Design a protein with these regions (language model features):
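Polybasic/polar functional segments that serve as interface/processing modules
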Residues: 1-143
C-alpha cells in the first residue's frame, strides 16, 4: 500500500467515533476541460480503465457503455451537452464512471471505492489520458 493511502486509513482509524466516523469510502471527482476528443471512444476508454485500475490497485469487473455506436444517424445525439460516450467500469469495491462530451471537449470522471486509493496518481493519469488542459478536482470521504 502506498504511503498516502496508508496515511488516509491511519488518520481515519485514529479519529474518535464521536467526532467523524471512519470513512466508508473515497470519491474522486474530476472535471476535465480542453480534452482531446479523440480519446472519447470505447477503445480508448477500455485502455483508460485498464491503466487506471492497475495504477490505483483496483480489480476490474463488468464494464458498460452508453453512446451512439450502432444508433441510426437520425437518432444520434447532436446537442453539445449530450453528444459523447458514457461508461461505467465496475470495480470489486465500487465503480469508475466517465461521461465525455465530444463537442465541448470535456470529460467528467468519478472514481469511488470503499478502499483507499492514491488520488494524486488517479488525477495525474486521468488528466494525461484525456490530454486535458484544465482539471477541477474534488475529493470526498464518504461516511
Amino acid at each position: 500500500m502506498c504511503e498516502c493511502v496508508a496515511r488516509q486509513w491511519e488518520e481515519a482509524e485514529q479519529t474518535p467515533m464521536c467526532e467523524i466516523p471512519k470513512p466508508y469510502g473515497f470519491e474522486l471527482i474530476l472535471d476535465l476541460h480542453g480534452c482531446d476528443a479523440s480519446t472519447f471512444n470505447r477503445e480508448s476508454l477500455d485502455g483508460y480503465f485498464a491503466k487506471l485500475c492497475d495504477a490505483i490497485e483496483m480489480e476490474k469487473c463488468e464494464r458498460y457503455f452508453w453512446d451512439d455506436v450502432g444508433v441510426p444517424l437520425d437518432e444520434q445525439q447532436t446537442e453539445p451537452h449530450t453528444k459523447g460516450t458514457s461508461a461505467v467500469q465496475f470495480i470489486l469495491t465500487s465503480s469508475v464512471v466517465v461521461h465525455t462530451l465530444d463537442l465541448l471537449e470535456a470529460a467528467y470522471v468519478n472514481i469511488f471505492s470503499c478502499n483507499a486509493f492514491d488520488r494524486d496518481v488517479a488525477e495525474k493519469l486521468t488528466k494525461e489520458w484525456f490530454r486535458a488542459s484544465e482539471c477541477r478536482t474534488t475529493f470526498i470521504e464518504r461516511v
